[in-house]
């Protein structure tokens, strides 16, 4: 199946009331794991590449691995999404490279560490929407800074994360401002700030309403019911994988992620895209540590990497099933990018 746009996939998810996990990918094993789980569950896929992933693997390598995935799994719709673009120029390069969706993160300045002002965010996001929509490519924007309501820290992943201590107002998207932002930019999807953060260390305890503002999602959705909402920093940090890592020599302190049941509350009130990275990293790291420890004479890295792929696949499958994605892939008929470009006009 040809690659599809984020807008088409999230429109389908909105119509049928499910959420789509968006998995960050860096290598072959991760893409294999995601596609195998998608095939098993008949789920559509969002494969997204951060700046760190593009630097690590090379954009051309990532693009061709995703094209290979589309060729190998012709019945699975795939969105190729650029995560956290730092400027219109970065987004333009990704569009030219074949990405079907880009994120312009104007909540931060181009250094991806300095919080921006509202007018800057509107300006750069609007410019990307005009450019992307002209060729049928979808755009995700961000309003508010990702950060922990518990600590005031943004967390950092692949070089993205506001520096310093943030105020609660900065870390919570304002619903009325969200309405204005969407009207002025034309984004297809909006990443919102509700107290989640990048990385494994999100919360020091199982999150409750004082540090995870799930109820804010409903307030935002009521203001922009036709714009798809996105949760970033939404790995659940499975405790079983933390225990395996520790059991086989890892040193990870106590930490908690976003519970799946809280994500499901978000999906019921307008969240359609859920970004997940850390969960796959934990599963792969735990599986590799276990594999190497159980056979110390093994020197073929493929054995450990196969174990890593199996671990990642188990996490991905659980998310597809939990979010209501399973069984949806075969219902989606691709819309050509040229046709979408006409629709945007």
From Swiss-Prot:
Identify the residues that bind Zn(2+) 1.
84, 198, 232
Any one Gene Ontology MF annotation carried by this entry is: zinc ion binding
Query: Which keywords, in A-to-Z order, does the entry hold?
Result: Calvin cycle, Glycolysis, Lyase, Metal-binding, Plasmid, Zinc
Please give the pathway this protein is involved in.
Carbohydrate biosynthesis; Calvin cycle; Carbohydrate degradation; glycolysis; D-glyceraldehyde 3-phosphate and glycerone phosphate from D-glucose: step 4/4
Q: How is the cofactor bound?
A: Binds 2 Zn(2+) ions per subunit. One is catalytic and the other provides a structural contribution.
Q: Which domain of life is it from?
A: Bacteria
Q: Which InterPro entries does this UniProt record tie to the protein?
A: Aldolase_TIM, Class_II_FBP_aldolase, FBA_II, Fruct_bisP_Calv
Q: Which residues bind D-glyceraldehyde 3-phosphate?
A: 50
Record-level GO BP terms: glycolytic process; reductive pentose-phosphate cycle
Q: Which family does it belong to?
A: Belongs to the class II fructose-bisphosphate aldolase family.
| NCBIfam families for this protein | cbbA (TIGR00167), FruBisAldo_II_B (TIGR01521)
| Purpose | Catalyzes the aldol condensation of dihydroxyacetone phosphate (DHAP or glycerone-phosphate) with glyceraldehyde 3-phosphate (G3P) to form fructose 1,6-bisphosphate (FBP) in gluconeogenesis and the reverse reaction in glycolysis.
Subunit comment for this entry? Answer: Homodimer.
The name this protein carries in UniProt is Fructose-bisphosphate aldolase, plasmid
* Source species: Cupriavidus necator (strain ATCC 17699 / DSM 428 / KCTC 22496 / NCIMB 10442 / H16 / Stanier 337)
Gene behind the chain? cbbAP
């Amino acid at each position: 199946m040809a690659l599809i746009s984020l807008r088409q996939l999230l429109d389908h998810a909105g119509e049928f009331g499910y959420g789509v996990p968006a998995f960050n990918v860096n290598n072959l094993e991760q893409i294999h794991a995601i596609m195998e789980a998608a095939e098993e569950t008949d789920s559509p896929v969002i494969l997204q590449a951060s700046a760190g992933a593009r630097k690590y693997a090379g954009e051309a390598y990532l693009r061709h691995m995703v094209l290979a995935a589309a060729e190998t799994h012709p019945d699975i719709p795939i969105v190729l999404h650029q995560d956290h673009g730092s400027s219109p120029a970065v987004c333009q390069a990704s569009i030219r490279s074949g990405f079907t969706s880009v994120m312009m993160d104007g909540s931060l300045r181009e250094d991806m560490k300095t919080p921006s002002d509202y007018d800057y965010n509107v300006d750069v996001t609007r410019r990307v929407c005009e450019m992307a929509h002209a060729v049928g490519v979808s755009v995700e924007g961000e309003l508010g800074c990702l950060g922990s309501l518990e600590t005031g820290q943004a967390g950092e992943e692949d070089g993205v994360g506001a520096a310093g201590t943030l105020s609660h107002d900065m870390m919570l998207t304002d619903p009325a401002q969200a309405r204005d932002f969407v009207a002025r930019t034309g984004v297809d999807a909006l990443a919102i700030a509700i107290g989640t953060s990048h990385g494994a260390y999100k919360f020091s305890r199982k999150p409750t309403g004082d540090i995870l503002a799930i109820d804010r999602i409903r307030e935002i959705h009521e203001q922009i019911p036709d714009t798809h909402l996105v949760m970033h920093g939404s790995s659940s940090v499975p405790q079983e994988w933390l225990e395996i890592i520790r059991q086989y020599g890892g040193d990870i302190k106590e930490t908690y992620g976003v519970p799946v049941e809280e994500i499901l509350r978000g999906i019921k009130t307008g969240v359609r895209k859920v970004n997940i990275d850390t969960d796959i990293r934990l599963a792969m790291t735990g599986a590799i540590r276990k594999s190497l420890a159980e056979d110390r004479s093994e020197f073929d890295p493929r054995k450990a990497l196969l174990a890593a792929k199996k671990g990642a696949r188990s996490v991905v499958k659980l998310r597809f099933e939990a979010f209501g994605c399973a069984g949806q892939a075969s219902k989606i008929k691709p819309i050509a990018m040229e046709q979408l470009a006409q629709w945007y006009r």
